């Protein structure tokens, strides 16, 4: 008889958001492993649909979308229909965290966060109500944070006997927006440690920050080559340009975390152009995302504004198409004493492109997991601010070598380690999760 798995994730297909990818892919590949999968999820914030995830969801037979009370979504929809979005100017110091001053701004931010908490509470109540309709038992409930409510609903499923085992997963670290909520956070974390049969997170850094290092296990994000269109359907590139592609966010919505800083790569490219390794007419800095002005500001500061090719916010399919056309894929992150766990899902999406990946990592610590993964897989190089001049010189040398290969029409990707890369395919990650479930069943027998 097939194992039964219950997945609780606010973010899920067909939502067009990065948080929906992980649970959707795990559900898809657990289904292919023979699991009967039931999913409880929310409706998302903006109603936009990801056609790729929508296709994945067709393999699932029981996805229950809960329409929680969400005044923020309604407000967003009203604003969107009332007027086109205004383009915001870049911050004066793009390397500093964006700050909103003034009492009215602080009150507005507090009201927004307060409503988010009540929206989360609404999802929890709807999820528990839906759980009461299900026939058990499920062999396992897998809940993936954020928000808070997913684990609270999963705790109810475990406590009520609806699910025999509970795996509590984290794609982000748990944090509270207000100091007065910190006692609740401590109780929440105690509940997880006491009742979850297994704690998993997308990185070892997150496990460490949440004090799960001794008991938790890393289940990283990954990639799915089925997301890519067939190569034969894509026209071959004919232009003679060196395309550096950045997809996604630049600003960070975390306290005490600066904007993602890609200027080290831009400076390395400008230095290469000054050394006649390529002309600025041959260079394209390609961006897709909703922070075009900041991307342009970074490029202008490095003398590369004329090289920018801005696509704005695009669908995931369009983003993947731009990545396929890249010569180099660029990303950025941070590694701080209080923020060690950043192994972004964009890294693994980039991995399936067979293109060199360059990451610029800000922060006061060296030796990030991002740097380790890029080194172990041979997929590229991570330049860390904390490593100082050594990493900057290595980045310049690596960029120059890529340009020499490009000018000589040689393959740019020459150091890739296939086996190391394949461990991040969602097929492998679902098999790893299946193995843990079977291990927990043996321990519980």
Give, region by region, the residue ranges found by the protein language model.
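Nucleotide-sugar-dependent
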Residues: 18, 254-260, 317-321, 329-348, ...
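Conserved catalytic-core segment of nucleotide-activated headgroup transferases in glycan assembly
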Residues: 224-225, 236-300, 310, 314-316
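N-terminal subdomain of nucleotide-sugar transferases
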Residues: 1-72, 198, 268, 272, ...
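Carbohydrate-associated surface elements
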Residues: 202-205, 222
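A conserved catalytic-core segment of Leloir-type glycosyltransferases
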Residues: 41-125
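A charged, aromatic-enriched C-terminal amphipathic alpha-helix characteristic of glycosyltransferases
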Residues: 385-396, 403-439
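Membrane-proximal helix-turn-helix segments that form the acceptor-binding/catalytic region
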Residues: 25, 118, 122-132, 149-152, ...
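Acidic anion/phosphate-binding donor-loop and adjacent secondary structure
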Residues: 51-52, 72-77, 180, 223-241, ...
């Amino acid at each position: 008889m097939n194992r039964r798995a219950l997945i609780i994730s606010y973010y899920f297909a067909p939502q067009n958001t990065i948080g929906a990818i992980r649970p959707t892919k795990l559900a898809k590949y657990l289904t292919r492993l023979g699991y009967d999968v039931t999913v409880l999820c929310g409706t998302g914030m903006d109603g936009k649909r990801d056609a790729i995830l929508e296709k994945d969801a067709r393999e699932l037979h029981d996805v229950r979308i809960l329409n929680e009370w969400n005044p923020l979504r309604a407000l967003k929809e009203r604003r969107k229909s009332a007027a086109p979005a205004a383009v915001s100017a870049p911050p004066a110091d793009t390397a500093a965290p964006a700050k909103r001053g003034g009492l009215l701004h602080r009150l507005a931010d507090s009201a927004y966060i307060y409503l988010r908490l009540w929206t989360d509470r609404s999802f929890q109540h709807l999820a528990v109500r839906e759980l009461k309709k299900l026939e058990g038992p499920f062999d396992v409930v897998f809940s993936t944070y954020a928000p808070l409510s997913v684990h609270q609903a999963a705790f109810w499923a475990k406590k009520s006997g609806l699910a025999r085992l509970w795996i509590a997963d984290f794609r982000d670290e748990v944090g509270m927006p207000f100091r007065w909520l910190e006692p609740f956070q401590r109780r929440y974390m105690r509940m997880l440690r006491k009742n979850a049969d297994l704690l998993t997170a997308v990185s070892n850094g997150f496990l460490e920050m949440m004090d799960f290092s001794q008991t938790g296990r890393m289940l990283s994000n990954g990639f799915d080559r089925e997301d890519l269109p067939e190569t034969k359907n894509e026209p071959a590139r004919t232009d003679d340009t060196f395309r550096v592609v950045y997809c996604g966010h630049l600003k960070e919505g975390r306290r005490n975390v600066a904007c993602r800083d890609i200027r080290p790569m831009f400076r390395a490219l400008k230095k290469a152009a000054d050394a006649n390794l390529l002309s600025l007419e041959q260079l394209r800095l390609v961006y897709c995302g909703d922070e075009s002005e900041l991307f342009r500001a970074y490029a202008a500061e490095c003398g590369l504004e004329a090289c920018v090719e801005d696509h704005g916010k695009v669908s995931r399919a369009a983003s993947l198409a731009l990545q396929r056309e890249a010569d180099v894929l660029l990303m950025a992150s941070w590694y701080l004493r209080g923020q060690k766990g950043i192994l972004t899902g964009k890294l693994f999406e980039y991995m399936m492109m067979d293109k060199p990946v360059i990451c610029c990592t800000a922060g006061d610590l060296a030796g990030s997991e991002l740097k380790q993964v890029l080194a172990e897989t041979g997929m590229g190089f991570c330049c860390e601010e904390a490593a100082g001049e050594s990493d900057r010189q290595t980045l310049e040398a690596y960029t120059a070598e890529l340009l020499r290969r490009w000018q000589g029409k040689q393959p740019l990707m020459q150091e890739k380690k296939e086996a190391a890369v394949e461990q991040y395919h969602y097929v492998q990650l679902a098999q790893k999760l299946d193995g843990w479930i079977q291990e927990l069943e043996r321990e519980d027998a």
